[in-house]
Amino acid sequence: MGTNLSVPNPLGFFPDHQLDPAFKANSDNPDWDLNPHKDNWPDSNKVGVGAFGPGFTPPHGGLLGWSPQAQGILTTVPTAPPPASTNRQLGRKPTPLSPPLRDTHPQAMQWNSTTFHQTLQDPRVRALYFPAGGSSSGTVNPVQNTASSISSILSTTGDPVPNMENIASGLLGPLLVLQAGFFSLTKILTIPLSLDSWWTSLNFLGETPVCLGQNSQSQISSHSPTCCPPICPGYRWMCLRRFIIFLCILLLCLIFLLVLLDYQGMLPVCPLIPGSSTTSTGPCKTCTTPAQGTSMFPSCCCTKPTDGNCTCIPIPSSWAFAKYLWEWASVRFSWLSLLVPFVQWFVGLSPTVWLSVIWMMWFWGPSLYNILSPFMPLLPIFFCLWVYI
């Protein structure tokens, strides 16, 4: 540093530049802060603490001398406040005066006492400001309900938002039906598999059922006769067994439904009187409403004259049941009436044609089943959508 006795203080370690180079107490050297050739560091004017912190000085004096700053005595120099002129410039400025109402809201000046009085005569406005029976002119007039007045005023803005709870409850029913339908379908499909396993086990009493088609020219692995692949010769026999099982299950369901409807009196089949012809006159059941009407009951087998007796035409229960199902389906699905000519033509075919159809189903049935099997779960979905929508 040469002859410059001013020591720079970049880190603020030395207190206020009161360091004596010769470590002489009470030296006559001038205050180094008054030296015009000193280094002006940012922390040069800050008052520091003693060598060992405030309030702790060794008995023989500190390393920095006996000056007050070296002994850890802090002196605070009051700072003069800024002038009053700059105090307003740095702080919040005063709020200016508000302009008059006639300049900011000219439309409010149009509401004079006459216009306001005429507006209050509107019953919708009166219902908002005056209670029932109240009046500004002293006349007691009936006042509409406030809710109805508000709704009438707001009716021009558009329809209210639909209630989402009603929409959610309307969709919950079909979703539950679809879930129950899929669950029932999975359980129903396990019934034919169980019956097929029982059927094939009759040919292998005490042995493990094995498909006999694996010994043919087709190189396939050993498998059960209830799980034949399409290339196995026993695949068509498996389809035939399952088709017969499905027909038996359907027949049992129809018989159960027929017994239930007959027990409830929904199939009024007129019995034959012994020793009479196909038609008889006598007491008969009351004729029910046909399926084309408001009820789902089938047509009665007899006509009822005015004298209380009716002419009964005996028909079998199965025919009455089939007629009932056809009329119910025709009422629900109007397009079934277009199939009547085709069904009549199909029924009138010769036995040769029927055998040909059975043979085609036997030959092409497995291939069609592989094509249509992915779409089978969609049938209950379409049925539920048709019924509920």
From Swiss-Prot:
Keywords: Acetylation, Caveolin-mediated endocytosis of virus by host, Fusion of virus membrane with host endosomal membrane, Fusion of virus membrane with host membrane, Glycoprotein, Host-virus interaction, Lipoprotein, Membrane, Myristate, Transmembrane, Transmembrane helix, Viral attachment to host cell, Viral envelope protein, Viral penetration into host cytoplasm, Virion, Virus endocytosis by host, Virus entry into host cell. It is found in: Virion membrane. Systematic vaccination of individuals at risk of exposure to the virus has been the main method of controlling the morbidity and mortality associated with hepatitis B. The first hepatitis B vaccine was manufactured by the purification and inactivation of HBsAg obtained from the plasma of chronic hepatitis B virus carriers. The vaccine is now produced by recombinant DNA techniques and expression of the S isoform in yeast cells. The pre-S region do not seem to induce strong enough antigenic response. GO terms for biological process: caveolin-mediated endocytosis of virus by host cell; fusion of virus membrane with host endosome membrane; virion attachment to host cell. Its main location: virion. Residues 2-242, 192-242, 359-364 are intravirion. Isoform M is N-terminally acetylated by host at a ratio of 90%, and N-glycosylated by host at the pre-S2 region. The keyword Acetylation applies. GO terms for cellular component: membrane; viral envelope; virion membrane. The keyword Lipoprotein applies. Residues 2-170, 264-337, 388-389 are virion surface. Residues 2-108 are annotated as: Pre-S1. Interacts (via its myristoylated pre-S1 region) with the host SLC10A1/NTCP; this interaction is essential for viral entry. Belongs to the orthohepadnavirus major surface antigen family. HAMAP family: HBV_HBSAG (MF_04075). The large envelope protein is synthesized with the pre-S region at the cytosolic side of the endoplasmic reticulum and, hence will be within the virion after budding. Therefore the pre-S region is not N-glycosylated. Later a post-translational translocation of N-terminal pre-S and TM1 domains occur in about 50% of proteins at the virion surface. These molecules change their topology by an unknown mechanism, resulting in exposure of pre-S region at virion surface. This is Large envelope protein. It comes from Hepatitis B virus genotype B2 (isolate Indonesia/pIDW420/1988) (HBV-B).
